[in-house]
Design a protein with these regions (language model features):
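Radical SAM enzyme [4Fe-4S]-AdoMet core and its adjacent flexible, acidic
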Residues: 2, 6-133, 137-141, 160
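Short, flexible helix/strand-to-coil boundary loops that buttress conserved ligand/catalytic motifs
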Residues: 12, 148, 199
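Short glycine/proline- and charge-enriched loop/turn segments
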Residues: 13-17, 163-167, 211
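Short, charged/polar low-complexity linear motifs in solvent-exposed/disordered segments
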Residues: 62, 162-165, 205, 235
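C-terminal accessory region of radical SAM enzymes
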Residues: 94-123, 149-196
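Radical SAM enzyme core and accessory elements
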Residues: 155, 181-242
Length: 242
């Protein structure tokens, strides 16, 4: 979902060549969820939020509650912020180093809890494949990239051939690692084992480089953890993030 009914339908436009335009995509999905929740033991729903639709999350929760009824305990809402990419000029995305993003996550988590919905988040960095010698992305032309999000971006191009992938990956990591910068910037940071200096793809989006900058999220992590402790753990009595 991309918001409440109005926003979601503006962003998820029905293909007029395939579907009747009189149909409401948002309501159709809600009806499907009602049916699916009566069949399956667990359903995961993703809610993409930005600086506009975050304020309509409670309306979405009310609609979802009305749709699934007594089966709401089967629903898990995955909260994920919309971020910048090199392919768009969208101005309402969140900078993932910003404290505002941390506070918005907490607000959405609180709303989920109050409505009785389970949730998970995409706040913390996932393990990165960019400097891994055991992972790569293969495109439809047989080119090898170091990052799953980097399709067509030459800075992440490992090789134009699938021959001798191992040596190509070794050479790429040796040439493109930012270990010397991380050693200086992250030496005393308790989050280093979690983020390992941040995401190379996000560095590219923000700075145009994959090795000369650090997309540091320390202040965002500090804010999220302290806000979670005060607003969720203490006030709501919830001890963990699913």
């Amino acid at each position: 979902f991309d918001g409440n009914e109005y926003i979601n339908n503006k962003r998820r436009i029905i293909n007029e060549k395939v579907h009747d335009q009189s149909k409401n995509a948002y309501i159709s999905i809600m009806k499907n969820l009602k049916m699916l929740s009566s069949i399956f033991e667990q359903l995961s729903i993703k809610y993409n939020f930005d600086q506009v639709n975050k304020d309509y999350y409670t309306f979405f929760l009310e609609d979802l509650e009305n749709a699934v009824g007594i089966n709401k305990d089967k629903i898990i809402i995955a909260l994920e912020s919309i971020q910048d990419t090199p392919c768009n000029d969208y101005e309402y995305y969140f900078d993932n180093t910003d404290k505002l993003l941390s506070k918005t996550y907490i607000d959405l988590i609180k709303s989920s809890i109050k409505k009785g919905f389970r949730y998970n988040t995409k706040f913390f960095n996932t393990p990165c494949m960019h400097l891994s010698k055991n992972s790569f992305m293969l495109d439809t032309n047989g080119k090898i990239y170091s990052c799953i999000s980097s399709f067509g971006i030459n800075d992440f191009l490992v090789s134009s051939s699938t021959e001798d992938i191992v040596s190509s990956l070794d050479s790429f990591v040796e040439k493109n690692n930012n270990f010397s910068i991380l050693e200086k910037h992250c030496e005393d940071c308790c989050y280093f084992p979690l983020c390992f200096g941040g995401c190379a793809y996000e560095n590219y989006n923000k700075y145009g480089t994959i090795r000369d900058k650090v997309n540091c999220r320390k202040h965002a992590y500090d804010t999220f953890i302290s806000e979670f402790y005060e607003e969720i753990f203490i006030k709501e009595g919830i001890e963990y993030i699913e």
